From Swiss-Prot:
<feature type="active site">
    <location>
        <position position="163"/>
    </location>
</feature>
<feature type="binding site">
    <location>
        <position position="60"/>
    </location>
    <ligand>
        <name>substrate</name>
    </ligand>
</feature>
<dbReference type="GO" id="GO:0140722">
    <property type="term" value="P:mycophenolic acid biosynthetic process"/>
</dbReference>
<feature type="active site" description="Nucleophile">
    <location>
        <position position="139"/>
    </location>
</feature>
<dbReference type="InterPro" id="IPR000073">
    <property type="entry name" value="AB_hydrolase_1"/>
</dbReference>
<comment type="subunit">
    <text>Homodimer.</text>
</comment>
<feature type="region of interest" description="Abhydrolase domain">
    <location>
        <begin position="58"/>
        <end position="246"/>
    </location>
</feature>
<keyword id="KW-0378">Hydrolase</keyword>
<comment type="function">
    <text>Type I acyl-CoA thioesterase; part of the gene cluster that mediates the biosynthesis of mycophenolic acid (MPA), the first isolated antibiotic natural product in the world obtained from a culture of Penicillium brevicompactum in 1893. MpaH acts as a peroxisomal acyl-CoA hydrolase that converts MPA-CoA into the final product MPA. The first step of the pathway is the synthesis of 5-methylorsellinic acid (5MOA) by the cytosolic polyketide synthase mpaC.</text>
</comment>
<dbReference type="GO" id="GO:0016787">
    <property type="term" value="F:hydrolase activity"/>
</dbReference>
<comment type="pathway">
    <text>Secondary metabolite biosynthesis; terpenoid biosynthesis.</text>
</comment>
<comment type="similarity">
    <text>Belongs to the AB hydrolase superfamily. MpaH hydrolase family.</text>
</comment>
<keyword id="KW-0576">Peroxisome</keyword>
<dbReference type="Pfam" id="PF12697">
    <property type="entry name" value="Abhydrolase_6"/>
</dbReference>
<feature type="binding site">
    <location>
        <position position="140"/>
    </location>
    <ligand>
        <name>substrate</name>
    </ligand>
</feature>
<feature type="active site">
    <location>
        <position position="365"/>
    </location>
</feature>
<dbReference type="InterPro" id="IPR029058">
    <property type="entry name" value="AB_hydrolase_fold"/>
</dbReference>
């Protein structure tokens, strides 16, 4: 259990201002709160100066607590590195953050907001987050942590991307409007049950093959007791299930309402076609990120494509962990790995040993909750390598800085910038422009 290995501290911090989409909140002046959990290992001895601070991002609608067994396993297998702390925040519209913000949230969601929220969180707690920082992201959390690295290229020493949603095309299982598809399922699914036990039974297909520790956390954090703003009348819900006689059973719903889960997966583009002329006109105030080539489609999601197109510039080194049975487009992930970090401003990419892809055969998109040890294994090996590199770079930088003046420029400046000819301008000087 994480509480046995970590001291768990909860925080509430403000979200970033202004949000990417004006329709994300009821009013644009609403202040959102972000629910954060800080996991500090219960070290027996002093913490090394180079212990890692992890910043993690969860998948769509998946409570941050589901990843606690992953942190337990990572802590147990540390070798060649130490953990200073692990910080995970629920996205503003999901889980505990969403509950805090439910009177302020509206029906739009951008993946670009959470990277800014995390950056705000990091600066807020900077005294508790010494370098090196390592980013961890699963699913759309992998996209989020990558965009945080774009926002501040030198923030992270390395990234661990677990089946990240970074690709040009929609997944092969489809994001179209016709079933079957994840968005169809999300919108039309049942979202209220007569008890927590009934909810777990109804969702057993989702948790099939999960580690029991993750199943326990699913039962605790994925659902929420009624009443809620969506379901304020508990007795009416009980009557719906003919459960009024069972006074001990409390009906539950999803901790992240299905509507917020849906708009995190896909975004509406219902008004691009002018009803009078029939022409497609992108509403720039709300849909500036719409690709004009596909502006006629009613649903889209811009961040996987925009993030993919910038992969060449990714500065931190990066480990991609991909499920062999993932629903994502594996061929496009392979192409993303090839270009990752290879461009101007990037890490150097695969050719310089800064980017690596590991495929885990037989594992699907939810592998952090299935074969936890199998997922942690390549992470540990990669962190050992990258921490060796980090320590070497720190030593070299320290040596280079020895004896340097912090008050005047070094002599090379005077060698490169030649002196001005005498007799120019007033008093022999050329005036500055």
């Amino acid at each position: 259990m994480s509480s046995e290995k970590f001291t768990v501290t909860e925080h509430l911090v403000p979200g970033s201002y202004i949000r990417e989409y004006p329709g994300s909140t009821v009013t644009q002046e609403d202040v959102l709160k972000i629910h954060v959990k800080q996991y500090t290992p219960k070290h027996e001895g002093p913490v090394p100066a180079d212990a890692i601070t992890f910043i993690a991002a969860h998948g769509v609608g998946l409570p941050k607590e589901l990843y606690e067994p992953l942190w337990d396993e990572l802590l147990e297998r540390t070798n060649g590195f130490h953990i200073h702390g692990i910080w995970v925040a629920d996205v503003a519209s999901m889980n505990q953050s969403g509950i805090q913000n439910e009177d302020k949230l509206s029906m739009d969601c951008s993946w670009m907001d959470h990277p800014r929220d995390l950056f705000l969180m990091i600066n807020h707690f900077r005294e508790q987050m010494p370098r090196p920082l390592v980013g961890v992201g699963h699913s759309f959390g992998g996209n989020i942590i990558t965009n945080l690295a774009y926002l501040h290229p030198r923030l992270f020493t390395t990234l661990l991307l677990i089946d990240p949603l970074i690709q040009l095309s929609p997944p092969s299982m489809g994001f179209g409007t016709d079933p079957p598809g994840p968005i169809n399922y999300t919108l039309w699914r049942n979202d209220v049950w007569p008890s927590r036990e009934a909810a777990i039974r109804a969702n057993r297909g989702l948790i099939h093959g999960w580690d029991p520790r993750c199943v326990d956390r699913m039962a605790k954090y994925f659902f929420r007791d009624l009443p809620t703003p969506l379901y304020p009348d508990v007795e009416a819900v009980k009557a719906r299930f003919d459960a009024a006689a069972d006074t001990t059973a409390t009906p539950v719903t999803l901790a992240t309402p299905k509507y917020h889960e849906l708009i995190a997966q896909i975004r509406q583009n219902f008004n691009a076609r002018d009803p009078t002329t029939g022409r497609i006109e992108i509403p720039r105030a709300t849909h500036a990120d719409m690709d004009p080539l596909v502006a006629s489609i009613p649903l889209y999601r811009p961040e996987p494509r925009s993030t993919f197109r910038r992969l060449g510039t990714l500065r931190p080194s990066c480990l991609w962990i991909v499920g062999g049975a993932t629903f994502l487009n594996v061929d496009e992930i392979h192409e993303g790995v090839k270009i990752c970090g290879s461009g101007i401003g990037g890490s150097g990419g695969v050719s310089e040993g800064r980017v690596k892809e590991v495929i885990l055969p037989g594992l699907g998109h939810l592998m952090p909750f299935q074969e936890i040890g199998t997922v942690v294994g390549p992470c540990v090996a990669w962190l050992q390598q990258e921490m060796d590199r980090f320590r070497q770079m720190e030593r070299e930088w320290g040596e280079e800085r020895k004896g340097k003046s912090h008050l005047v420029l070094e002599k090379n400046w005077y060698k490169v910038l030649k002196p001005m000819p005498s007799g120019r301008g007033k008093g022999g000087r050329k005036e500055k422009l």
